[in-house]
């Protein structure tokens, strides 16, 4: 533990000093360069595979599993939800450009009109409200999770394209970045502890994955057929370090996701995926 914290502090100073006044694009390029130096054999597009890139046997097993994905039945449920008309006869596809295809990579975005970050799940609930339906709970994986696992798959292959433009958007991005690097919980860890400073190491049997590429494949199916959204995963991670998580759909998580997604700009969307 002492070695882990020492290494964390060292790399934190290295990255933090250079990124203190960096623009979002400078942040992204700096992280990419950091990972390229650490893992010179990983091609950019392969970062969608996460920690699997660091374990050839696990990647081979994953590719075999994905020939017959264990979550197909739940994906079918999500498709049915997406295509079932609301009481007024309209569908989810009517709320989004191109019928919901090749557009999820634009989320989250900062909406100047309401002054806050809008996630894809928020857009789903906005669609429901506009059509006289009740909102779905952001942490309900049997509804919101399954629905978005399917609907985000309609954007597979689209490159992540998050924009941070304007003073208020930059402020939201910076708050998300601060949350990413803020240590919390009894273990005093941050998101960046595992996914930047200690990336590639093993912690509690888990091979730690790069933050680059995280945001392009959620929701994902973990431990078989349990669908998990990115923000639910945030809560799980904070609980793992014995901290108090924020609420799914909160400003803190939305802005964290904004930062987290921006650094994966240019990577292809791939939803859902299977992880152990």
Locate predicted features.
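Bacterial N-terminal signal peptides that target proteins for export
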Residues: 1-8
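Residue-level detector of functional hotspots within protein domains
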Residues: 8, 48, 177
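Bacterial N-terminal signal peptides
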Residues: 8-16
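Sec/Tat signal peptide C-region and signal peptidase I cleavage site
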Residues: 18-22
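Electron-transfer interface patches adjacent to heme c in soluble/periplasmic c-type cytochromes
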Residues: 23-73, 84-146, 153-157, 182-276
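Short, charged low-complexity linear segments at domain edges
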Residues: 61-80, 158-177
